[in-house]
């Protein structure tokens, strides 16, 4: 049969804080995407416009005692995707998000526990995205994600994402 595609849902009536919603989402992610659990990803901030996820160095280390490039790529990709998932849950209900293009730049090695911050498009652009999803059922959204170390961007991601509403079951 077809592979199971997780549909992440949010109970909008729980009164949870945004950070608590992000943490609950990460628990779902750990269950449905084993790599996220292995990497020990954790939500540390979500304000409705930017999301920060962190990861410890130890399970993500390479042979040079720095963060493995694949782990860094995974973290920036998941952080951007999760930011759009959380935003769409809050504003649109159940949606799918898929990355359709990305560019990652590795500027400096990361030598300790690390975090990535995704910032959604500016309010006017993300509002236009919501309008398009409501009217056409889908839209594209671009965002930036960065991992900083020692006050400088060590890794950056620019990604295009498709966002579409989940058909009612």
Locations of regions flagged by a protein language model:
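Active-site helix/loop of acyl-thioester processing domains in fatty-acid/polyketide metabolism
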Residues: 70-91
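Polybasic, low-complexity association/targeting segments
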Residues: 8-28
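Short Pro/Gly-enriched beta-strand edge/turn motifs at strand-loop
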Residues: 21-28, 36, 125-128
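HotDog/MaoC-like acyl-thioester-processing domains
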Residues: 9, 13-15, 121-169
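Catalytic strand-loop segment that frames the active site of acyl-thioester-processing enzymes
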Residues: 38-67
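Hydrophobic beta-strand-centered segment that forms part of the acyl-chain substrate-binding groove
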Residues: 84-122
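Short structured motifs
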Residues: 37-41, 100-105, 128-130
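Extreme N-terminal basic, low-complexity initiation segments
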Residues: 2-7
